[in-house]
Amino acid sequence: MNKAILITGIAGTGKSAVCDELAKLGHKAFGIEDIDGLFTMVHKKTGKPFKDYDNDNLEKVKQADWVCDKKKLQRLMSKNSNGLVFYNGTAANLDDLLPLFDKIFLLKVSQRVLRERLSTRTSNDFARTAEVQKWVFSRKTQWENHLIKKGAIAIDASRSLNEIASDIIKRSKSSQ
């Protein structure tokens, strides 16, 4: 069984932690946002790399897109096509990337849990400020609903990492 599985979600839902858990369980799992050269922060108006981007500055956050290089992602995927392979991340051009995957899992948590995670996480500085968090929350429901309409399978990410990973593995192996 060869399957490419995407695990995505809004900032703070636990994508990286779930990816790490899947790797601990012996699966191939890639945090694609952490791979050098695969993503670029671009200015929405120019499409060029954003020179002075700042995760804490709401105006700059609103002007930027986090874009994945589809061709580079395809090369990574072609080198890792044996068995069940997990990729985690999100991108402004996610709709363009979705057809590359056999299944898409959307990690979801409540706004309360999300606020707590964003405020206390140390692995990533995106949405640390209350101002940027408010902006993230304003987009959360619409973005999640959009992905579900595109075929993403919603996963309750407020559970333990082991429960989440086990659920994703089980559903990844099923034909539905």
Please describe what each predicted stretch is.
Residues 100-121:
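Conserved phosphate-donor/acceptor-positioning beta-strand/loop module used by diverse small-molecule
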Residues 60-100, 108:
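Glycine-rich phosphate-binding loop used to anchor ATP phosphates in small-molecule kinases
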Residues 20-71:
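Conserved substrate/cofactor phosphate-moiety recognition/catalytic segment
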Residues 9:
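The Walker A (P-loop) glycine that initiates the GxxxxGKT/S ATP-binding motif of P-loop NTPases
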Residues 94, 120-167, 175:
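Small-molecule kinase domains that catalyze NTP-dependent phosphoryl transfer to phosphate-bearing small molecules
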Residues 13:
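ATP-binding Walker
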Residues 16:
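Walker A/P-loop
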